[in-house]
Amino acid sequence: METWIPSEWYDDILDKIAVATQQSVCSQKPTNFYEAYWPNSIWTKNTQYALGDLITSPTANNFLYECVSAGTSGGTEPGFATNATATFTDGTVTWKTHNNYSIVSTPMEPDDFIKTEIEHGKQLQVKEKVGILIYKSGPIAYTALLDVANKKMLHVTKATSVLGTPLEKGNLTVFYTYNIKHVAEQ
């Protein structure tokens, strides 16, 4: 069977991916935004948190915490839940627990993406980023592109050329250039 897809559809798909505001390297395949996102906020005592705020624990475990009931955190560090989807109270805040596989991430800008035509389709090149601080040790498995403002995961790809390479917390790393291709079946 021969198929044909209008080239503007490729543009639409790639344009939706190119609004990404964060790129993350993950130790496992993320299936949602929370598993790939790493917030810049670490839990702090006696702090006002709004609905939807995202934090990590001071020990940087493999979880991310979402404020599901706004309030003020307690004066001492809570017992952070370590079961995905569990909730717990901290002062007057209620947190929901999410698995998190992100080990390093970097902000993305519109000029970090270059869309070009290729034979039978289009591609989106994601530019290289260097000197990115690793915040959690783990092996490289997947790269995710995220729309942070809308809490959406836009694209995930297996990091085949560096799959399994261990990253160590505190070191610097490189996010290599890669291409996202949409090609018509021939």
Predicted regions and their residues:
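Short beta-strand elements bearing conserved aromatic residues within extracellular beta-rich modules
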Residues: 65, 142-143
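Tryptophan-rich substrate-binding surfaces of secreted polymer-degrading and adhesive proteins
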Residues: 40-100
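Small cysteine-rich, disulfide-bonded extracellular modules of the LU/uPAR three-finger superfamily
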Residues: 1-39, 100-142, 148-186
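Hydrophobic beta-strand positions
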Residues: 55, 145-146
